[in-house]
Amino acid sequence: ASGVDRRELRKLRRGQYAVGRRLDLHGFTAKPAVAATIRFIEDARQGYRCVAIVHGRGNHSAGRAVLKEDVRALLRSHRAVLAYTDAPRDDGGSGAVYVLLRNRP
């Protein structure tokens, strides 16, 4: 994650940022989930530094964890995302991500 220093990334991994908003994608299919994630990130940038996105682990998908992979691919390329990491185990673990957002210009 370029543009983020080690301390910030460590804080994010440890769940030390207050999660301002949360998006739960359970029950979504791939395209609507990606669209909802884009809207969520854009809206959250209005006043939140850290958000959580619950995409699930893909236990009910045949073959691959579609939502997990698609959401994380989006996060890798979205200009508003400074960094992201698995949520702490007690808040979804690998079935959720904490996202650190860039300050809105």
Residue ranges of predicted features:
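Long, charged, low-complexity intrinsically disordered regions
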Residues: 1-105
